[in-house]
Amino acid sequence: MAKRVQLVLNQDISKLGKSGDLVEVAPGYARNYLIPQKLATNATPGILKQVERRREQERQRQLELRQQALEQKESLEKVGSLTIAKQVGENEAIFGTITTQDVADAIKAATGQEVDRRGITIPDINHLGTYQAEIKLYSDVAAQVDIQVVAS
């Protein structure tokens, strides 16, 4: 079996790994492609310590983000229900629909917190009534909020 060299990736490379990963590759692949293109660095003890330090910092940052998401979830669920007023036509049908941006604006008005509209999941809202919205705050943290649609 041919000798393999250990490298630390500087960038994400499909089929090989993510930035900061320790990988073993053929010496020619490392010497002719990865190192000249600055996609990887030789895995020296100093570089390995640096990578481990970066991983620990990233782990701490992710823990802090998750904790903030949990606190935000708690405050969102304390609000209870959000009220959104829309113009109404026949049969209590609203003009237009309620969008995720409308929900994000209602959350900001009620709590003062910014919520990314891309993390909000709502059903199609075309009539007056009460609906449930799910707000994804972190990969495993989501808040449930009631939306009350009323006539303006």
From Swiss-Prot:
Protein name, UniProt field: Large ribosomal subunit protein bL9
NCBIfam families, alphabetized: L9
Phylogenetic lineage: Bacteria, Bacillati, Cyanobacteriota, Cyanophyceae, Nostocales
Function text: Binds to the 23S rRNA.
Organism superkingdom: Bacteria
The keyword Zinc belongs to this UniProt entry's keyword annotation: no
Name of the gene encoding the protein in the UniProt record: rplI
Family the entry assigns: Belongs to the bacterial ribosomal protein bL9 family.
Keywords, comma-separated and alphabetical: Ribonucleoprotein, Ribosomal protein, RNA-binding, rRNA-binding
MF GO annotations: rRNA binding; structural constituent of ribosome
An example Gene Ontology biological process: translation
Family matches, as Gene3D superfamilies: Ribosomal protein L9, C-terminal domain (3.10.430.100), Ribosomal protein L9, N-terminal domain (3.40.5.10)
PROSITE patterns, per the entry: RIBOSOMAL_L9
Any one annotated GO CC term: ribosome
PANTHER family in the cross-refs: 50S RIBOSOMAL PROTEIN L9 (PTHR21368)
